[in-house]
């Protein structure tokens, strides 16, 4: 199923009740990119991965710059960095798109934002999930691989590897500010190899429907 929209930022009209706007320019760092993407990059929240001013995930901060450069080198982005990057076959979003007034989101706040993230992930229906950092990786492993507790969440070891999930291919990305020499190239090489392969898998998204109806995508 193809999403028909010309909106790059917040293409599905998510409206979480953020306690405060990220800035005068942006209410939140909404999901951004190609609404029909096969590759979905998943970050934590704007305070870590950027986007408070731009309203775009993975902008403004060094972590976002590193991710965007990797996307450029692998053909997903048209330039090495942009506050409003032009992306193809790639979507960017956060577990927590709002900017809490007190800084870091609480566990309750993350839980409140979960339904918005899950709805967006279902709508994108990407085949490859790229969680950035340990929190995003833990969430993806728990929700989309059913392997939590069976995978050691050592991001240095997992970085740029392939983890098979419930219809998804998961490619963990170490926190970019922790990258050591070669980590950026490892990610680039991994993404290039995946793009050249048959990465599309049948994903069972039935659990998102809340009914007995079966919903599979490829």
What are these regions (language model features)?
Residues 2-218:
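A polyanion-binding, active-site-adjacent surface
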């Amino acid at each position: 199923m193809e999403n028909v929209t010309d909106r790059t930022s917040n293409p599905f009209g998510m409206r979480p009740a953020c306690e405060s706007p990220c800035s005068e320019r942006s209410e939140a760092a909404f999901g951004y990119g190609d609404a029909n993407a096969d590759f979905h990059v998943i970050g934590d929240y704007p305070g870590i991965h950027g986007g408070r001013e731009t309203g775009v995930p993975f902008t403004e901060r060094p972590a976002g710059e590193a991710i965007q450069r990797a996307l450029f080198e692998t053909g997903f982005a048209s330039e090495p960095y942009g506050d409003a990057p032009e992306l193809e076959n790639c979507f960017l979003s956060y577990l927590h798109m709002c900017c809490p007034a007190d800084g870091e989101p609480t566990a309750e706040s993350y839980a409140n934002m979960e339904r918005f993230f899950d709805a967006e992930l279902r709508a994108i229906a990407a085949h490859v999930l790229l969680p950035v950092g340990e929190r995003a990786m833990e969430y993806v492993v728990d929700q989309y691989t059913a392997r939590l507790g069976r995978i050691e969440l050592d991001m240095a070891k997992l970085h740029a590897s392939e983890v098979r999930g419930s219809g998804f291919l998961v490619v963990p990305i170490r926190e970019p500010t922790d990258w050591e020499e070669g980590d950026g190239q490892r990610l680039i090489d991994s993404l290039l190899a995946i793009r050249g392969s048959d990465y599309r898998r049948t994903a069972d998204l039935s659990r998102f429907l809340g009914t007995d109806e079966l919903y599979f995508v490829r």
